[in-house]
Amino acid sequence: MGSKDHAVFFREMTQLILNEMPKAGYSSILNDFVESNFFVIDGDSLLVTCLGVKSFKWGQNLHFFYLVECYLVDLLSNGGQFTIVFFKDAEYAYFDFPELLSLRTALILHLQHNTNIDVQTEFSGCLSQDWKLFLEQHYPYFLIVSEEGLSDLQTYLFNFLIIHSWGMKVNVVLSSGHESDTLRFYAYTMESTDRNQTFSKENETVIQSAYKSLIQHLEEIRVLVLATHFEHLKWNDMMEEAYQTLFLLQHLWSEGSDIQRVLCVTSCSLSLRMYHRVLVHSNCLSLQEVEDFCRLRCLCVAFQLHLPLSQRACSRVITCSWIRNSDSFLKMNKWCEYFILSNLNVFGCWNLNLNHVSDLYDEQLLKNIAFYYEFESTQEPHLNLGDSIRRDYEDLWNVVSHLVKEFNVGKSFPLRTTRRHFLRQEKSVIQEISLEKMPSVGFIPMTSAVIDEFVGDMMKDLPILKSDDPVVPSLFKQKTSDELLHWHAQRLLSDDYDRIKCHVDEQSRDPHVLDFLKKIQDYQQFYGKSLESISTKVIVTQTTRPKEDSSGASGEILQNTKPHQITKKSKKKSFLKEDQNKAQQNDDLLFSIEEEMKNNLHSGIRKLEDYLTSCASNSVKFGVEMLGLIACFKAWKKHCRGEGKISKDLSIAVQMMKRIHSLLERYPEILEAEHHQYIAKCLKYLGFNDLANSLDPTLIGDDKNKKKYSIDIGPARFQLQYMGHYLIRDERKDRDPRVQDFIPNAWQQELLDVVDKNESAVIVAPTSSGKTYASYYCMEKVLRESDVGVVVYVAPAKSLVGQVAATVENRFTKTLPAGRTLCGAFTRDYCHNVLNCQVLITVPECFEILLLAPHRQKWVERIRYVIFDEVHYLGREVGAKFWELLLVIIRCPFLVLSATINNPNLLTKWLQSVKQYWKQADKIMEEKCISEKQADKCLNFLQDHSYKNQSYEVRLVLCGERYNDLEKHICSVKHDDVYFDHFHPCAALTTDIIEKYGFPPDLTLTPQESIQLYDTMAQVWETWPRAQELCPEEFILFKNKIVIKKLDARKYEENLKAELTNWIKNGQVKKVKRVLKNLSPDSLSSSKDMVKMFPLLVEKLRQMDKLPAIFFLFKNDDVGKRAGSVCTFLEKTETKSHPHTECHSYVFAIDEVLEKVRKTQKRITKKNPKKAEKLERKKVYRAEYINFLENLKILEISEDCTYADVKALHTEITRNKDSTLERVLPRVRFTRHGKELKALAQRGIGYHHSSMYFKEKEFVEILFVKGLIRVVTATETLALGIHMPCKSVVFAQDSVYLDALNYRQMSGRAGRRGQDLLGNVYFFDIPLPKIKRLLASSVPELRGQFPLSITLVLRLMLLASKGDDPEDAKAKVLSVLKHSLLSFKRRRAMETLKLYFLFSLQLLIKEDYLNKKGNPKKFAGLASYLHGHEPSNLVFVNFLKRGLFHNLCKPAWKGSQQFSQDVMEKLVLVLANLFGRKYIPAKFQNANLSFSQSKVILAELPEDFKAALYEYNLAVMKDFASFLLIASKSVNMKKEHQLPLSRIKFTGKECEDSQLVSHLMSCKKGRVAISPFVCLSGNTDNDLLRPETINQVILRTVGVSGTQAPLLWPWKLDNRGRRMPLNAYVLNFYKHNCLTRLDQKNGMRMGQLLKCLKDFAFNIQAISDSLSELCENKRDNVVLAFKQLSQTFYEKLQEMQIQMSQNHLE
């Protein structure tokens, strides 16, 4: 096969791919149901993957198509948009498998004709130019491809596809090893890295040559194979023979037919003719025997035509194979099928029904028929076929006879005229179905208040096991290891809050601790004030009202006494003098503004607008506005008489119209006739005669002046095109007494009303629209009501907790009783004032811990409001399970905030149903409490009156309008320079999108873009009927209107969109396509190395005044590198200048201060050493501060060589107190990135990503807000949260994580409210197809996931039985069980959840966690504490109870408390198999592993652990199978009998008149809980007990999958049955204590590796603490071993982190 060099290259290419496999990330490949995830599936990889499924048997076409459709439906149901590509060259790989050639062709036909999937078959190969162009035009997120083919040759083809995709910067997703659930599709992603791209580029010539060599070799194989079967007939000859056969049939069946009949008769006739012509050898079947086989084939098709799937699923399973002599004919027949199917496209006009192209061959049915006629038909009486089957069979055979002209094929009966058996005679021919393995179907009787209320209605209809059933008595005699007898296994453990160490003792009265806490609070307030310039509000509790003045009349008498009169007069004089001074200052300021406008209009206008912002008097404002208008008018006349004769500067006209807009809209009551006349004059000079006449009809114009001063643009077009972002918005003018700082919009007022009425609300509003204000108003309300009420703010990520906490500390201050604080925080890493604060900032995971803790209910009852920010994370992969539970378990009002939800109505209705439940529950509990109170038995904590005042209404508050418009720009690189092209949002759309979905709700246009759309429409359709009506000057809302408002422009935009949609509806699709094409920018011009152009991009943005800007990237390493490259760019362009005296004066002043500090320190050192130490520290920080200022070189670095705001820097340096730099510099002094961040900050640059310390991130955030940094490179860490707005957002790196949701979140940062009227979004190095998809895609819909797990059920039962308030606990548990989003208005889903709940209880009883009353038993607390690691937590407890850890953990010597390294390594091995599971794709095991110390693949569990795990899995699997058997009784079997994607039904009336059918289809037992499609391959209910097949055979409509069973196999098989090894990163780290080697050998990135190791260390610590609490014997070997392991692992990790930090600093 080609040269030796090519063979070597094939191995090199294969090894490269294998080496990349440990680095493959296993995650959800579709980012949370986002439509922008367009990708490509390689059709042959899809075929090979489904062929390799363990439950599938070759020859069962219908089962195969079912598997294909299941795979595709899982992708589509999760929002996937894809194209399937079948390369022509890929056909060569199947010439040794002709049965797959016909199957592949049938698959293509099925997908093209029976589904809406886009199928591409025109590409010759993956190296063709057409394919390369396709990738460039569509730029898929990834390509799904198989890493292994059916042969080495096919594997090489897949390898070429993978390498080429990497070279085109397209990621690869492996088609095998995938899993899916109700929300997500998980698979392995192999990213296109620089290394892979380099390999592809450097070996481009070799790749082309090797590929051609491979295809040439495959072509040679094709010639040999055809010669074997058809001798001298070539490929084209066979294609012609197939065409002629079809042509003859078309004349016979001119009215049409279906594909099953057509293929049957044509393939049989063509096979017979070819066999007769070329193959009549002694070792093959005779011609008469071949005729018999074709008769059986025709009868089989007749069966397929008449038998519904329900009957065929009961077929006997024939295990014997065809005799070897029949191989030649069988392959020839398959070749003929392929040639026939390949010719079908030629007969396009023939009425051919392709619905059942998926059911062309059923080998099991054929074998059944053959077996009967060979072994069973000799017995009397013979079984009849039935009239309909017999008739169809005879028709088929008669057509075969007609098509075969060369010889007589005989009559249709008898079917067998020869004696040779086609099936081999074997001992066991028919597969026997044994149900002995299947468990007893039934539930152990249980009872409790929760169980009875939730599933009581269902229990009466379910099978209940009797007490004498062998399963029941065996449950309660489980042996526990003797070593555990002294353990308090039933003890409730402390929760995470108890174990997370606070930095200090918050209750301590130690002065040093109090001083430290005061410093923390001061810094938090400083941090908050830095993020937002809002003054602190003092909160006074409403119950503590100020005392009334008791002086009464005496006070008035005192005021009238002489001394008071004298004081009053003096004050009056003082006020008069002060007013005079202010008036004089005001006059001076106005004079300076007027002079400035004369000298520089635009500079003067900026000062004027600053003055207007600070001025409170309307009359003064009016006068200033008139002053500005007069100045603009004079400047316009002067300009037009001078430079304007050549080209007019319309910015002056824009400023003039801005003043006119403001005067007419804001001061109508002050305007008089003379003002109207002057404004009319201004309009006249601009050429707006109609507008001028509407103000002053008496105005006489001068035609000469008109031509000289006119802008020659209509007033409406001028306002839209040049004043779009200045247009006045319709805002309320009446102030709300509840809001001091601004006038709230109508929707904001509605929010305030919601909070005032104690209602709940779902708030959907764009970023920076002001929805966060409602959160702070809610906090203030709770703070004012009492000192005990709590408001909980749930942030989506822990990185935001510090930000929000700081803003709360800055906004509010309140005097509280001792032991209480205003604000607290709780994350898994940090807790501070959690239970004694009034405002708790936390994350979903930690809030869930508090809500489900039985002994935290008293604190939970204090919660008055919960605020959920960015709730669209309810649908995200990480943290989604917490959001849904929190929303249903809280009983207080809530605010749900989000900027991006596509289905807010559904979310609101669901939450309203939850609130209705709580309304009823609270009423019942209140009544019960009242009755119990009379008997002094009330334990209910709801006696607090605050719950009585809450409303149970849930409002939906929508705001669809951003305050600032966003303009999108595409960055291109041409001639080593960066250029910017405006991107019109409509250019992202297609006619198909508009026709199917309309315009995306958040795809809005700026007024300028609306004008551009109108002009393009008018240009494309010159005779457009509505062109005049929609012309800006004639549009009804614009005509003769002086002040066009933002709302008018929005309505104009809506009219244009509606009109464009109507064009499509009225058949003008081509015109719409031209419009969209004309709006699209030209193709992007890019450089080969866009990274090097990044600094130039930043510089160009600075020159255009588009800073501050956030540059979003998606790799932590790149974030720092790009920031560094920008700094280097500035250093190279730096020009030296001489320092000014002023700068030196600052340094001299600082030196004087330092000298004073030194002298003071000498005096104090002897008297007070501690105070001296404090001064020394201050001196060091001050010196560092001076050094920073000197390095800034304010006067040496020109404004062109720093991105900082020079004015902000000047202010910072001249400030004597509270310097920002002086506060933040010491905090990053010893951090890992501190030195680098300070160096970058001196140039106004920073970076921000998740791996930074929180102090480093705060450093960047504070300086960015202050203007000291104006260029920040960042990952998505700055996409969420608050207080980081900027003028521009730049997407500077593509990634699979750049989807529609993240795009909206990140782009929302652009445009600072109150500072920028327009936000800018730039795309740099992002492919144009990707940009279009981002803009055109809808935001994700929130969908419910499967809400229950075994451990969650255990935690709920713990809460119900151990809760401080039983009634409250019960109500919360039932709310969780009854109100999942998945089951909302879905009765069938609720039934499944109830059954799963029962299954969970049964398993918990059998594993001895619960008793029959639902109360917790042994180790329930331990299992529930490790709830985040199911099923590993259950397995761990199982091992512990069996005594396996006690057997393993033997001290080094008797009496010792230390354990050997060997014991520790074995313990790590066991725990890594439980808590450090990261699988590697199965194909990796073929790699040539040659590592000295580090092994990539984790070793198996020790034998005793492995045996125990097998027993555990078998027990769980049987219980789960029992659950599936019961659940299957209520599924919708009609849906189970249709293909899931094409919805083609295989239902119908069962054939009852055929004795043969009844005989063959007699196996109904054991096929209850599996899909009827999989029964065709001989699968039974027993396959539910096999881990490699359970997900493949389960009923799709049952609503669960095998992932819901808490199984943990020592190995994992992929879909093709190959074993997937575990990554040994944990054990290798423990052994070698080296992260670098792990990074290189184990294939995990450093950041990911560090995170996983930290999680593992946290788990060990949690287990160690738990065991210590459960065991009183502190010398217990297991307790000691885990303690030793926890300490050593933590020390190794700390040592490694310190080493990494030191290396970074060096």
Curated annotation (Swiss-Prot):
Alphabetical list of InterPro entries matching this protein: DEAD/DEAH_box_helicase_dom, Helicase_ATP-bd, Helicase_C-like, P-loop_NTPase, PIN-like_DDX60, SKI2_subfamily_helicases
Helicase C-terminal domain location: 1205-1354
Superkingdom of this protein's organism: Eukaryota
Annotated Gene Ontology cellular component terms: cytoplasm
Region ranges (Disordered): 545-580
Keywords, comma-separated and alphabetical: ATP-binding, Helicase, Hydrolase, Nucleotide-binding, RNA-binding
Classification via Pfam families: DEAD, Helicase_C, PIN-like_DDX60
Catalytic reaction equation(s): ATP + H2O = ADP + phosphate + H(+)
E.C. designation(s): 3.6.4.13
Residues annotated to bind ATP: A765, P766, T767, S768, S769, G770, K771, T772
Any single biological process term in GO: defense response to virus
Motif (DEAH box): 869-872
Biased composition annotated in UniProt, kind: Basic residues: 565-574
Biased amino acid composition, Polar residues: 551-564
MF (Gene Ontology): ATP binding; ATP hydrolysis activity; double-stranded RNA binding; RNA helicase activity; single-stranded RNA binding
EC class (word): hydrolase
Family to which the UniProt record says this protein belongs: Belongs to the helicase family.
Protein name, entry field: Probable ATP-dependent RNA helicase DDX60-like
